[in-house]
Amino acid sequence: MLATDSDPIVAIATAAGRGGIGVVRVSFGRGGEAAALPLIDALCGQKLAPRHASYVPFLDAHGAPLDRGIALYFPAPHSYTGEHVLELQGHGGPIVMQLLLQRCLDAGRGFGLRLAEPGEFTRRAFLNDKLDLAQAEAVADLIEASTEAAARSAGRSLDGAFSRQIHALVDDVITLRMLVEATLDFPEEEIDFLEAADARGKLAKIRAQLAHVLGDARQGALLREGLSVVLAGQPNVGKSSLLNALAGAELAIVTPIAGTTRDKVAQTIQVEGIPLHIIDTAGLRETEDEVERIGIARTWSEIERADVVLHLLDSRTGMTPDDETIAARFPAGVPVVRVLNKTDLTGVPACVEHPAAEGDLTEVHLSAKRGDGIDMLRAELLRIAGWQAGAEGVYLARERHLIALRAAQEHLAQAADHAEQRAQSLDLFAEELRLAQEQLNAITGEFTSDDLLGVIFSRFCIGK
């Protein structure tokens, strides 16, 4: 534990700016009640009943009121952080909040009260076993959720839905490890612990459950991160019109002049609760215009980072040699959908054509101008992302969770291989189970380095 993890800390817990209510939060750390009671007396001029709302003045150093509001005192361990906590709920003006924060710092100087770092209140909740690490991350995810579906999924993670799944897997792995260790420790016994307890069947069940959890986690990660979709193609094929059609608003300038878009225009839209980050880019062509060339270079940078590229073509000309040149430069690992726009000029009905042979691309025929085929394109993007329509009970997950789950999956696959070789590989079987458990424990924070904790909590807002 870092030395600063026990310092008394204070911060404004509400968002910056003006609001009806603002909150200053104090967690007293090692100071405990000996620090809390004098600070309460200095700021409120009276004792506070634990866990009761008291309407009191907030006093300056001379006893004059800075504000009036609600004071709440939560003695340890029954608080958000597990420490003694004081919350002062006043009027949400930035000046009065700063005055109240500074008053707390001045009154608490004697016992070492300092400003909290980003995420430090939630970090303490984790260190004091009020939340596990997956739940702590869900606090930040709930605050940052960009769609209703993401917010509801983050709420389920905060409630412990994801953690319960992980704990159940860990318990099953521990049970299996006990059987293996018993067989290793008592080789002379006539009882075959593994056969008697159907160890292979138990392992198969664990692997099936892990696959289910990983599938749900992928859905949750998609809700959290969304999908980065880059619109690419030659100038004047309708990229800006398609952005406007997908967003349902006039976000980009649309003209018949080639090269109108010289820098990216980005917009996030929701499709079934999934954030789609749509990026309209400069048209790809040879040009002597220095500003346009910079925009084109940025387009290729966006394509390199994309989750999906929509390669727009004019349906009147189809795939031209210039389009072939562009397509040849697309990164091999990025999915590409060929979008033939302007079907309103050709009379071709809007449709989706899936590849008939390996290596072919999905083609979507649409009219961005009329909106024909836009819903088909949205559905195709969700299909590429792997979204399961109507999925219930999904919890939000992060990339580190997916990495840990995949690693655990690989260790269990190795364990299954060793189980088949039984006599020669029992030690390796046990080791793979241990490594799988270690990966699962890292998700909830039961086995996590201080460096990782520092990264996770540094991304929280101050006061949370």
From Swiss-Prot:
Record note on cofactor: Binds 1 potassium ion per subunit.
Binding site for K(+): 236, 255, 257, 260
Subcellular localization: Cytoplasm
EC number: 3.6.-.-
Binding site for (6S)-5-formyl-5,6,7,8-tetrahydrofolate: 25, 87, 130, 464
Pfam family, one: MMR_HSR1
Cofactor annotation: K(+)
BP GO terms, sorted: tRNA methylation; tRNA wobble uridine modification
Residue numbers binding GTP: 236-241, 255-261, 280-283
Matches recorded under PROSITE patterns: G_TRME
Keywords from the named record: Cytoplasm, GTP-binding, Hydrolase, Magnesium, Metal-binding, Nucleotide-binding, Potassium, tRNA processing
Domain TrmE-type G: 226-386
Job of this protein: Exhibits a very high intrinsic GTPase hydrolysis rate. Involved in the addition of a carboxymethylaminomethyl (cmnm) group at the wobble position (U34) of certain tRNAs, forming tRNA-cmnm(5)s(2)U34.
Subunit structure: Homodimer. Heterotetramer of two MnmE and two MnmG subunits.
Family assignment from sequence similarity: Belongs to the TRAFAC class TrmE-Era-EngA-EngB-Septin-like GTPase superfamily. TrmE GTPase family.
PANTHER family cross-referenced by the UniProt entry: TRNA MODIFICATION GTPASE GTPBP3, TRNA MODIFICATION GTPASE GTPBP3, MITOCHONDRIAL
Protein name, as recorded: tRNA modification GTPase MnmE
